[in-house]
Structure formats: C-alpha cells, structure tokens
C-alpha cells in the first residue's frame, strides 16, 4: 500500500493528538510501516532518523531484539490480570528494581498507565496524605512557570504553558506559580548555579508564606522539556528539597521525560543528591514499547493510608490495565539493557560527541543558545541575536525546520522556535 493512499484514509477517520488538523492540508502526514534501530520507514521505502525518540520514549531503538523477546515470552504466559487482589512476577520484579535504583527512603511502587495519569495520582496521593493526617488546610500545589506536567485536568492544573492550558483555565484547580530558574534568562556575568540560588529566593518566600495550605511542590528536574527545553542548575533542587523539609511540604519529582538516563544520570534529581517524597516515571520506562507509568514513594506516605477498611483511609486510585504484565516485562527488559550495557557511562561519551556536532551553531546569527544536559540538546532560534528579539510565533519557524528535516530524512518536532535533538541511545 502506498503512503499517499494511507494518508487519505487516515485523514477521514483519525483525529491526531496535539495537532491542528487543518495543517495537514499543507503539511505532509507520514505513515510509518516499520522501524529498526534509530530509523523509521514509510510505505514507499523512505527512511527517517528518529531524532526525538518518537516523543521521547524510545531508548534502545525500534524493534529491539532483546525487548521483543521479553514481550513474546510474556505473551505466551499471561497477557493481563487485574492488580487489585492479584499480582504477578513482572510487576513485583519491576517494583523491586526501580526501588533499588532510587534513594533508600523510597520503598513503595504504585502503578498508573501514562505520564499525565501518574501526575494526577501523585497529586491525589499527596493531598489525601495530608487529609489522613488531619491537615485539612493543605489543599494547594506550587509549580514553576513554563512547566508542563501533562494534559489531564489535574496535570494541566500544575502546568503553566498557555498554549495547552489557557482554554481550560475555568475548569482547572488553581495553582501557585513561581518563576522558573531557567538559565536562558540569567545575566551573562553570573554562573548558572548562582542564578539558581537567586531564583530560589522567590520559591522560598512563596513556601514560607503558603506552607500551611500547600500539599506539595511539583517540578521537572533539570529540564522543562515541553517548556521549550529550558534547563536549570541542580542547585535549585538542593535548595528546594531543604525548604520542603523545613516547611513540611511534599516534593514531587516529575521524571516522566527526563528519567532513565536522559540528563546524564539515571534520574535527574540524583544530580542534586536529594530524595523526593514522590517520583513519577513513564515514557522511557518500557523502552518506548508500551504505555506504563509508576509512582515511587516512601513508607511515611504509604503508612498514612494503611488502616482498617472501615476508616476509609485507603488510596482508591486505579485503572483497568494497572501494571500490565506485558508492559512490565518490557520495562524489566529495558532495565536489563541499562545494567548489561553500562548505558549511563556510554551515554556520557555519546552526549559529548553530540555536543561537538552542534557546537558550530553557537555562532549562527539566528541561534541565541545551544544548550545540553546529557542526551538532550536544544537550539533556540532568534530573529535578532544582539537585541534578543525572538521570531513571532506566527511565523512558525519551527515548522519550517521540521519540513526541512523531512526533506533530509530527519524526523523532528520543534517546540515553537526551539529545535531539539533527543535521540535513542543507540544512535
């Protein structure tokens, strides 16, 4: 079947995510038939380099032989069983392994099915904890400006990008927003670490003022990915962790996009040597194969729900495919590869090579910044570099770059005026 025929069929029946469908009157839809390694192949035999890991999920290449075998083996045993009142080996193994990868105070694993739902569940978990502890005034959340935590009503409430949020403001929970420590906006004469310290003063004052009413602070460690790949120094996380402990507030680390080696460590928060109260994981957890997410947390939070049934203190959050055995098997295979292939160490070498490839762009008259943390590199386009005047978003410079990439067999998905490179680790 030809790609053109599939496009016609698709546009009659499929409503695509995060897309203005009218764009496809001019912008080509790309039907993909197969994938192998870092390459995707359409129905006409044209191949595309997956430079964004298919929305940041694919870690070890498409059709990875090891993950394929793990999934096939699981398919022959058990495709699914409910996790309420039942359990299975893949879920137990995955929980144990994730807990071992995190600080010693992290002891429990709760399963959800995608990134947004894990944020919703984490918010409910924190709020419900304080209710069970009779701290009834703790009902609010603090988040950073330019943050993105998902598009369900809960996760969107703690996000701060108008493009996704503004239309729905009237039905969202009000959140306290504090200015992001984003290093892009720092003064040239100070370091990123010093900038983080200066910016944290705003967060500290907000926590001090509102702590009696706040359940948790939620942040994306080190990189605000959907927030135009803006990055900040880990010093901010150190200070934030201290403040949350001082004022008895939970710290929720949204590791959905940055976890599993993206920033140079297994998890972004580890660079600050802190222990969040709640850690949300998804995207790369299954190597890019299936939807799955987890929430890792402490005995302190778990114990607040452990009670006689009649007291109605249980955490009654669930979904039908909780800890699906096939997805858990893919996740366990992914962790096997991390261990057996020494991925974190190899990524340091690979990220240094990627940095060299893009260094020359720093001097381009329409590039204001080339920034990188681990296996994430972003290029900020600008109209006037000297005056720091950005391109009007209506010019859609990112889409121009996207189309240019397709012509050169590279699949990108720019964020406004920001191009980014976030490839599988096998590139």
Task: Briefly describe each language-model feature range.
Residues 1-427:
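Conserved N-terminal phosphate-binding loop of PLP-dependent enzymes in the Aspartate aminotransferase
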